[in-house]
Regions:
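A structural signal for short loop-to-beta-strand junctions that line the ligand-binding cleft
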Residues: 2-16, 141-151
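Residue-level detector of short coil/turn "hinge" positions at structural boundaries
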Residues: 6, 66, 91, 223-224
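Extracytoplasmic
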Residues: 6-7, 18-20, 39, 107-110, ...
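Structural motif
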Residues: 9-11, 22, 91
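Bilobed "Venus flytrap"/periplasmic-binding protein-like clamshell domains
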Residues: 18-86, 97, 202-215
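Pocket-lining segment of extracytoplasmic ligand-binding domains
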Residues: 29, 66-170
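Ligand-binding clefts/hinges and TM-proximal coupling segments of bilobed small-molecule sensing domains
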Residues: 47-57, 132-200, 204-205
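An extracytoplasmic/periplasmic, membrane-proximal ligand-sensing/linker region
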Residues: 96-112, 169-173, 179-248
């Protein structure tokens, strides 16, 4: 077996911005709900499991699979959006802050598909495909603002991770240093606000390092529910690591 198996990475903190990963649709395709994707033309980016999974997750949200849509094979992310512009496809995933501007200015127009947080069963189907997707409200991106928000999902980026054997004091002071210096760098670029303490997600897909937990507890932000979630993730990592060691 390969020498490098599952790595027990642990979180320190992360940045959750005001954008989200959404499905951008051509406005003239009249896709108002995920169920409306049935029969539409969706890009399949050859050789990119990550991009394929993103689109698959939105199909799952609507209770659909690739059998319910027309698959349009494309060579990359940019080609997927060009296919929409050229009326060869109808929708593609993107961060709201980094895509959609050209489509919005085109005759087809842009419509971001909302994934309402109250639709619990839909979210369960989406997260079964893409467990890293977490609920959020986007106010940053093409056609989005505080007055025109989008109920959607996304994941923290960038994330600050470390190994379990890193000294707790070092990890704690790293989180403390970033938090204390937040006001000094928050205006450096639009996404920097995602490092704010109130934008941390303590129940994501990676467990937090003991030093980070100590810091967030000292800030009064770490709950019993966070602790239970963290222990489950740590146990999961231990099981996966043990299973790897047992492989021949």
């Amino acid at each position: 077996k390969p020498e490098l198996g599952p790595q027990q990475l642990q979180m320190v903190m992360s940045s959750t911005g005001r954008n989200c990963l959404a499905l951008g649709t051509a406005a003239d395709a009249n896709i108002n709900t995920a169920a409306d994707l049935r029969g539409k033309r969706l890009p399949w980016v050859i050789g990119s499991p990550a991009l394929q999974t993103n689109v698959t997750a939105f199909l799952a949200y609507g209770g659909l699979t690739w059998d319910d849509v027309t698959k349009v094979e494309v060579g990359g992310f940019d080609e997927a959006w060009k296919a929409i512009l050229n009326n060869q496809a109808d929708a593609m995933t993107s961060f709201t802050s980094g895509g959609g501007t050209e489509l919005d200015a085109s005759p087809r127009g842009l419509h971001w598909l909302s994934t309402p947080h109250s639709e619990t069963e839909n979210w369960e189907r989406m997260q079964a495909v893409a467990p890293h997707m977490a609920k959020r409200i986007a106010t940053f991106g093409t056609n989005l603002s505080a007055d025109n928000p989008l109920e959607c999902g996304g994941f923290p980026y960038p994330i600050l991770v470390t190994s379990p054997d890193r000294e707790s004091d070092l990890v704690m002071n790293m989180a403390k240093g970033i938090t204390e210096q937040f006001d000094s760098f928050v205006s450096a670029e639009p996404a920097a606000g995602g490092w704010a303490t109130e934008r941390q997600n303590f129940q994501w897909v990676l467990p937090y390092h003991a030093g980070a937990v100590a810091f967030w507890k000292s800030e009064g932000l770490w709950s019993d529910a966070d602790e239970a979630h963290n222990q489950n993730l740590l146990n999961r990592q231990a099981v996966i690591a043990a299973a790897w060691e047992g492989l021949e």
